[in-house]
Amino acid sequence: MHKIMRLILVTTSTFCLAACSTVKHITVYQPIPANVIKTGTATAGAVSVDVTPPPGMPMGGYSIMANSGKGFRTRLKARVVYLNDGQGNSVALVQTDLTAGSLLVQHQVVAAVAEKTGLKASDIVITASHSHSAPVNHFENDFYNKHMSSGQGLEEQFLAFASQRIADGIMAAYENRRPAKVATGRKDIYGYNRNRSLDSYVLNDNVTDISLEDPEAKFKAINPAMYMIRIDVEDDKGRYKPLAAFSSFSIHATALSVPVEVYNSDLFAYAQKDLEWAIQRKYDTPWPVVHALTNGTQGDMAPALDDHGDNTFGHFEVNWKAAKKLGQGIGQEAIELFESLSSELTSDVEILTAARELNIRQNNTIGDIELCEDPAVGAPVAAGAYERRTPFLAAVPFLKGGNVFSRSWVFTEGCQGNKTHLGFKYLQPLFEPTDSFPNTVLFQLIKINDTLVMPLPFEVTTESGRRMAKRVSDEFATFGKNIKHTWVAGNANGYFGYTTTQEEYARQNYEGGHTLYGQYSTPYLAAQLGKLAKDMNTQEQVLELLPTWQYDIKVNQFYPDKIASTGKRTSLEQPAVFKAEAANEEDYIAFEWLDVGASEIQLHRPLVKVEALINGQWIEMHNAGEPINDDGYDLEVRLLDDEDLGMAEYQVRWYNPVAGGQYRFVIAQRGQQEELFSTSFVFAVDNAEATNKAISFVE
């Protein structure tokens, strides 16, 4: 018993911050938005901006198990879609490849763009694909700045970088708007997600057709809906061509497992870029196509990878091939949905938005529903979710969700129900003060024609999302308005962990344990959204914000120290081939070079590409429509080591190299460092010697 007690106390020690942490007071001034001029013509603009940070940021999602990013493979983006209905209403729909949105980022972005664009706080949503290989130390609360990654505290430089990049993206989309047409739609797709918490899902009162004995049940108990808002704009010759899609699919971006070492967009990268490249090629658009694919109700939706069972004492291997296959399947479904909407495009656009900002600890009742005033972490959070467990802790019954030891059997009548508090009920607040938890929700509704988007800062389970959507749709129906598509955008404008139904909560799986505000969270959120929907239909404008946007947050530094480089860029190791040795691995060609340090490398700018020698000329390479550069799928850039004179060693890996050509790596200019070229090389799969090493040529 004492050993178990010590283990639980050690577990709760992960909630501790060093006493010397610096607290920063941050104030964001609420702007006065400009008036949006009525032009009578719907307009739109869209842009993709890079938000890949320097090496060294802790990656979020896997908490203390996560690595710090050594570099990237598939860049992190913020995709912005600006839409104006011509009647004085506009929205900025922002999808990011981050683990979660941030209310602080949303506030800073609103403050940066409102006076120029007229966009109000209710008009801007910042969603996240929920990649578990992206930075997260940008929240307005200490709790998730401590516990969502392996680093503790707000990283001010990343906060400023992400906020500024998103604001710049909104401004660029706004300034490049063109006459627009819009279409909305839905397609149900199967075989891409599965329910990872089936034993909770079947407890829902309205679920009668799912059996735990059915091996296919986990593929049926899902949200299959892919939603999409397609936008075309007019080119210089008066022809309408595709510009963007803002879409949603419910799936955890955890196709890549815990040991991954570089920033990435997980399976979303493939689903996003496949559509962008395919549509741009087909329609020969004079602008880059933007596919802002975000997440929906992915709380209990795992990627439908091969099921290897649970992991108790270790992590599964990183499998990029499996992530790519699944992501490209989703991408093909998105392309088909996009194309099917061609005949639905209309220049008649109606935009309505509403927002109500609430401190839910201070405003924890609505009608007869009372939310917990004090949040609490359940014991199952320590052991993690199915397939992505915390090794060894998952072997402790009290910590592994879903079993009889992980939930309380006495004193279960309160708002936290049968949750067993991690570290015990009365000790947890000593390690984690309740004031450190997130408390402010921006309830928001965005209506574009017959589609209603409901952004929420929660990971919402499938059935929870259905109940919220029904509540909001019913409110609109009472006013004679038929909403065809109603969908939750999870992880948006902040992060609060999970929300399950009351029935699912009783099982106390990971999702229920991570429902901080208790068993009535979903009824409370549904009621608040329903009230907002009612007010949206009865009031001219609903925009209710807190009186001030002020935060006191513990800060830390993960960005590299700013050191001016004084050395000279040079090659270190010429291209060499590394063969895959396991089923989950890929062949790659590696090149190493000396370059400016981490503070100057600017990973958010293009850095590496592959060129092929064709008819005596070096041409930037493409393979089956995919550019072979660091904006594609197969180039990975990583920092190997710091060196003297402010310099650092880097490596680029070209995974899945194409046989039969003559190639070279090209490193883009940085500061005063000139463009750098590797020696040329070939790759041949039919020559044993050539597959063990690249053959270099001196030009």
Go through each PLM region and give its residues:
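Bacterial N-terminal signal peptides
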Residues: 8-16
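Non-catalytic substrate/cofactor recognition surfaces at enzyme active-site rims
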Residues: 21-699
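Bacterial N-terminal signal peptides that target proteins for export
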Residues: 1-9
